[in-house]
Amino acid sequence: PNDSNYSETCATIALAMFGKRMADMEKDASYMDVVERALYNTLLSGIAMDGKSFFYVNPLEVWPVSCMPRTSREHVKPVRQKWFGVACCPPNITRTLASLGQYIYFQEENEIYVNLYVANETEVTLNGVPFKITLKGNFPWENKMTVSVDGVQETEAMIAFRVPAYAENFKILRNGKEENLTEDHGYIKISGKMYKETF
């Protein structure tokens, strides 16, 4: 039930870390579906927008009267707290947010996997060639992202885009032309010459 699930912030982070490692080992996007859900639905709710208060547990529904002392849910707080007796959540949240780049991308030699559609810029080296990758968009409020891959010279490489399990009519345009590609373990993989590409 929504009012009695525990959804501990640190347990959610552990789930995300496990999912990330499994996805990286198996190259299976279903793990990143779990990671994405954990990050958006629990981790981000565990910290206030100003970063000064936190939830230890994150039930989906809270009735303040049921959180009073000497009730079965007195450990649940109806508002975020500035600190806890056991304060693992605040540093764990900030550490996870600081390492978000490791969740967005995986790299294996000349292959780059785009796992999370979070606006960002990063630099990678594919086959010895420096590339700048830029993701632009307003996910999850909008369902369109632009991914720019900008290399200093042309090289053979592969870029894999995660197809979220909830995505309907997912398609990729490469330099304005629709790609006719098949899905492999939840990723659409595009291989070949890469230089200055827009997806």
Sequence positions of predicted segments:
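Aromatic (Trp/Tyr) and acidic
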Residues: 1-163, 171, 183
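C-terminal beta-strand-rich structural cap/linker in extracellular carbohydrate-active enzymes
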Residues: 158-160, 189-199
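Solvent-exposed beta-strand/loop surfaces of large extracellular or lumenal domains
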Residues: 167-192
